[in-house]
UniProtKB/Swiss-Prot annotation:
Subcellular location: Secreted
Source organism of the structure: Loxosceles intermedia (Brown spider)
Enzyme Commission code(s) on record: 4.6.1.-
Taxonomy of the source species: Eukaryota, Metazoa, Ecdysozoa, Arthropoda, Chelicerata
Protein name: Dermonecrotic toxin LiSicTox-alphaIA2aii
Annotated S-S bridges: 57-63, 59-202
Main location group: secreted
Pfam families on file: GDPD_2
Amino acid sequence: DVEERADKRRPIWIMGHMVNAIAQIDEFVNLGANSIETDVSFDDNANPEYTYHGIPCDCGRSCLKWENFNDFLKGLRSATTPGNAKYQAKLILVVFDLKTGSLYDNQANEAGKKLAKNLLKHYWNNGNNGGRAYIVLSIPDLNHYPLIKGFKDQLTQDGHPELMDKVGHDFSGNDAIGDVGNAYKKAGISGHVWQSDGITNCLLRGLDRVKQAIANRDSANGFINKVYYWTVDKRATTRDALDAGVDGVMTNYPDVITDVLNESAYKNKFRVASYEDNPWETFKK
């Protein structure tokens, strides 16, 4: 029957790229995004400071939109709290692109702690009916794996270890898959792993490493649960990524991805993920 067939389709996360102003949350979700990616910059003391990308950024985008990090978290909480006037039921996942390149390696743990404190207070509302979206902490440098432990330790110290159920991980530096696996071993992490691969939309990048990540995901002993590709703005690239078997597509144009998912070749194999889809679960065909 139809419902059973629907269940066999791969759930897809359409990830709105560089959503750094509160007003852009609605803009991207209304275009079809069920998830967003937000840049987080840090000050010299490893405090998350702004949701800001800066120059250069993707072709065709303004690089300079920003909010204070905690203000953005409050706006995000409104958008992901059922019953709130600003609630967007479709928005189920947020990737924080952590710009830790400005920090010394020995500040990574501290950055994780401060990030957790901010999220706990301003997004999770101290564990009292806060935002419901799943969160992916995306780290650009494998050496900054202690950020994960700092984040986890802080939530535990503040009495909310259960919130780690809503948190996943990504290393975004396009490193060799084996090296990424080793970083997770050092961090003591198994599960809740998203693997990104990609490059700015100004440049072309093949799917070789995406396919390696997907092979790891689909192998019996792989450490990856989900694979996403960025930044995908064209229909042809979207089709190639879906054909390869990705779980997520990061884009400046969510409506383009939505259009492709509605094409006859794709609508019986893929569907837009909903809140009921566990983003930490490897999809089995």
